[in-house]
Amino acid sequence: MTTFTTPTRHTDRVAGLHYAEAPVRQRAVLTCGSWRRVTRRIVCGLTCALTVSSLLMPSVSFAAEWVKVDGSTYTAGATAGDGSTWAWDGADNMTLNGYNGGGIAAGGKLNVSYEGNNTVANDEGNSISVENVTSEGAELNISGTGTLTATAEGDALYSAGDMTISGTGAVNVTGDANGIYADNDLSINTSGTVTANGTHAEGIRAGGDITVTGGGTVDTRSEQDCGIVAEETLTVSNSTLTAQGFGIGIYAFDGLTIDAATVRAYAYPAREDSPTAIYTDEGDITIKNGSLVHAYAEGENAAGISSYNIYPGGSGGRIFISDSTVEAIAHYINRDNGNQPLPPICYSDFVVVEPDATARTFGIFALTEDGLTPATISITRSHVTAEGNTAAILAVVNSADGSISGTIDIVDSIIETPDGGRICDVHFVDNETDDILHQRGQTIGTASDVITDLYSDAIAKRAVIVPVDTPPAKPESKPKVTTAAATIKHVNAKDTLA
């Protein structure tokens, strides 16, 4: 039996220095563990309290009450600046043009517009941050055409409310805590680039929804935690997102939608292992409209793409892939650099050997509890490659009697690998605990009967599913049109990081 860990919701963090919290040990399950969010109810209570208090605040929009630039504080109503590299209009708007100095903070709303090359560094706190004040809630909006570089002992970019990053420029941030952190929603709507690195916490984190749109490129990583975390939903559309982290690459608590986008996610061993490249609980994973997805997880009990749900009234445990190309790989690889196994996110002097076939890993995995919507993996007109030491693709339901089953649906597509591959029923029983646990569902394999052994050779360790040919257009004399199966180059973990 194996326990799994999760990044926890930051329910009582204050503006300023944000550091990773200790993981919470979770309940063990037979095939893949849960990342139960034990603080969710606390968050809901705090949210309700904040909502009530917000109703008592004026609905009129006010200017920022103050700003602090490189150690000096300026109050609203009077303009400020150094005459060349930065200027504040005394309200909500600040411009940067060639700024090279210390941290920038504001009470309330702050719109930062940048051009030219700008550097903001703070070795005692956050680089650019906004906090709530009496007259106005925090809101940070950053837009520009040049380059904005921010480094911080705390969070590089922080908002106690919402945050928006837009424009055509390049935003490059590194925080000793988080790279980018918003207490509420985060919107990245840019045709430029955003690079966010978190040393001790996440590369990007939001307490609400995260949306990535605009056709730009977002690259985020963490050296000790998740690459990107949305405590509500994450939506990536018509853009490119690359996320690399320890434990989890992409974590969307309440659901993930990838729409006509390119997403690459990498997860490496952390804490007690069980890394997952793309993960949701209480929310489904939807990949559609020509999206290209590469998910790679390395470590024992790893999963490339996984959705899980044990909460009554919630969704999750369902993965929908349509008209897209997906590669989900999970392996345990022994890395020997003379000390202990270490992933390449921090080290370059390692040796890669063949995956250890004895470790338990899954390419695409869905799991729900009895009484909830059954686990489902649906693949429609898509090219899917999945690899796992234990199972390439698996959908199961936990129950006390085995009466409910997870399902795999393949529509307008065929199983190309393994030879003779089909959708197989599985029924695993755990008799090692006082409460007998049944797990019923489906996998890709070669058996004609129900598979009862999780480690059966009849379970495909590699599965390739491809779209069927499109029917010829009429009239019949026109050439036959086939669906082109886009491909994603499989990138070895050694080459994923600069």
Predicted regions and their residues:
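Intrinsically disordered, low-complexity repeat and linker tracts
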Residues: 3-39, 60-62, 432, 437, ...
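Alpha-helical transmembrane segments
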Residues: 38-49
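C-terminal segment of classical bacterial N-terminal signal peptides
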Residues: 46, 52-61
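A composition-driven surface/loop motif
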Residues: 62-472, 488
